[in-house]
Amino acid sequence: MNKFGNFFRAEEELHVPGVGADIEIMADDEKNLEVLRYSSATDSTLGLLFENGAHGREFLAYTLEDEFREEKVSAETRIPEGTYDVKLRTVGGFHSRYLDKFGADFHKGMLHVQDVPGFEYILIHTGNTEEHTMGCLLVADTSQQNITKDGFIGASVNAYKRIYPSLAQWLADGNKLTITYIDYDNPRN
């Protein structure tokens, strides 16, 4: 036991059992978003979005995605667990609508999850229910359970406006951004 009452030495890595990947302090030019999926239901998956950067882990928002499916159904299935690059997408309908909605000073491109096997155009955007996901990741400031009724997240635009600028600027500055999806909800059971 060290002087802080812990059973590990300061130079050892910290491991949080059952919560996915070890907490890793990232390099100054790298950030990793982490989606901890905690509740699967018939039509939706609820999660928590964290940012891992040079200063550790920070909670950003609640998330909502489509449900888990063994066989993909277009725009009705959450993406597989794993780590993916995120880039800015500056074409397409969502990009045009967000330019109109938020203006060019704010909106620099959609946060686009890259190279997901069997999926295209996976974006991080606003919305409240699984009907708004189209297979993408929705972010919000509030969350309601999806056990006895359909999943719902609220204040989505507020959350997006809070987290988007720093992530978009990070990417615009040429830094690396990844996102890791962790299935803590164990949907296969």
Positions of predicted regions on the chain:
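Cell wall/extracellular polymer interaction/catalysis modules
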Residues: G5-L177, I182-R188
